[in-house]
Regions:
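General beta-strand structural signal in soluble alpha/beta enzymes
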Residues: 14-15, 38-39, 87, 110-112, ...
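Glycine-enriched alpha-helix->loop->beta-strand junction motifs that scaffold or abut catalytic
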Residues: 4-11, 29-36, 52-59, 77-84, ...
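Catalytic beta/alpha-barrel core
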Residues: 8-21, 34-44, 56-67
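Active-site-adjacent beta->alpha loops and helix N-cap segments on the catalytic face
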Residues: 17-30, 45-47, 66-77, 96
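Flexible C-terminal active-site loop/helix
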Residues: 90-146
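Charge-rich, low-complexity amphipathic helices
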Residues: 27-28, 35, 50-51, 73, ...
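P-loop/Walker A phosphate-binding loop and immediately adjacent motor/lid segment at beta-alpha junctions
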Residues: 30, 62-64, 72-90, 131, ...
Length: 146
């Protein structure tokens, strides 16, 4: 399946197996033509070191990593280890998406569209414009209530 995906311009494969299947994931990674990214495997800073050699990169989500400071430390460590970086999200308001977007310049990929799934988002913040995350030019992280 990964071979098939690689022939169709897929960028990477995210968490192909349950997080407990560490050896099996490392086996897949050794044979994969695509980078293998950690998601459920990863929550906090110590998990980044555990991901080394098992995954090619990590998907950092603020809601799992406890916030900007921890997420930043995770990104710095992963970069030092030569890993790929992605900032991701779950279904979250524009407040959380805008906070996560502060780290986007450090990342190889950004998947920050969780606010688009909310019909009653109470915040105005980062926006997706032509596939690019644009940060507001306001103080702090730039979020305001609507």
């Amino acid at each position: 399946m990964i071979e098939w995906l690689s022939e169709r311009n897929t960028l990477f494969v995210e968490q192909p197996l349950p997080k407990e299947m560490i050896d099996e994931t490392a086996w897949i990674r050794e044979r994969s033509p695509l980078p293998i990214m950690a998601d459920e495997f990863l929550q906090r800073l110590p998990d980044v070191r555990r991901a080394e050699g098992v995954y090619d990169g990590i998907n950092i989500k603020l809601m799992k990593s406890t916030g900007l400071r921890e997420a930043y430390k995770m990104a710095v460590l992963a970069k030092a280890l030569g890993m790929k970086l992605m900032i991701g999200c779950m279904t979250e308001t524009s407040c959380a998406i805008t906070a996560a977007a502060q780290l986007a310049p450090m990342m190889d990929w950004a998947d920050l569209d969780g606010n688009l799934l909310i019909s009653n988002d109470r915040f105005d913040g980062a926006r997706l414009v032509d596939g690019q995350v644009t940060l507001p030019a306001r103080p702090g992280i730039g979020v305001v209530p609507v």
